[in-house]
Structures are given as C-alpha cells and as structure tokens.
Amino acid sequence: AKDGDFEGPPGCLKMGELCKGGTCCTKVYKYWKWRKLECLGKNDGWFKKKFICDEPCNPXX
C-alpha cells in the first residue's frame, strides 16, 4: 500500500470529505500504516457542526 490508498465499499468517501448521509471508506493508508476512518462531527463556526470522514482521535482535525 502507499499513502493515499483507501479501503472500503465502492464509491466510499475519502478522508476530509463531507459525510452527512454518506459512507466513509473504512481505512486510509497514511504515514506508513492503515488508519481507521469514521464520519465525525466537527465544530464549524458558531453552534454548527459539519460531518467529515476523519481518523478518530485525530488532533488535527
């Protein structure tokens, strides 16, 4: 595998993509290892949330 490779169902959403109602890929290969992807709610301005595919517990996040 190489950086940027994804695993998951066909047409799955990649890291950083908005995932409200969509399906994130299950894994992304980043920094020499497979990492889990989930649809996570991030604060987006005041009292708003956006849901993006990201690695759980990713501080940059």
Curated annotation (Swiss-Prot):
User: Can you tell which superkingdom this protein's organism belongs to?
Assistant: Eukaryota
Q: Which GO terms describe its molecular function?
A: sodium channel regulator activity; toxin activity
Recite the UniProt keywords alphabetically. Disulfide bond, Ion channel impairing toxin, Knottin, Neurotoxin, Presynaptic neurotoxin, Secreted, Toxin, Voltage-gated sodium channel impairing toxin
Give the UniProt subcellular location, in the record's own words.
Answer: Secreted
Where do the coiled-coil regions begin and end? none
Tissue-level expression reads: Expressed by the venom gland.
Entry keyword annotation includes Disulfide bond: yes
Kindly indicate whether the keyword Metal-binding belongs to this entry.
no
For this chain, the annotated S-S bridges are C12-C25, C19-C39, C24-C53
- A cellular component term (GO) from this record? host cell presynaptic membrane
Q: Name one Pfam family in it.
A: m_DGTX_Dc1a_b_c
Q: Which family does it belong to?
A: Belongs to the neurotoxin 26 (DTX) family.
Purpose? Acts by delaying the inactivation of presynaptic voltage-sensitive sodium channels (Nav). Acts against insects and causes a progressive spastic paralysis.
Q: What note about domains is in the entry?
A: The presence of a 'disulfide through disulfide knot' structurally defines this protein as a knottin.
What's the name of the protein?
Mu-diguetoxin-Dc1c
User: What species was this sequence derived from?
Assistant: Diguetia canities (Desert bush spider)
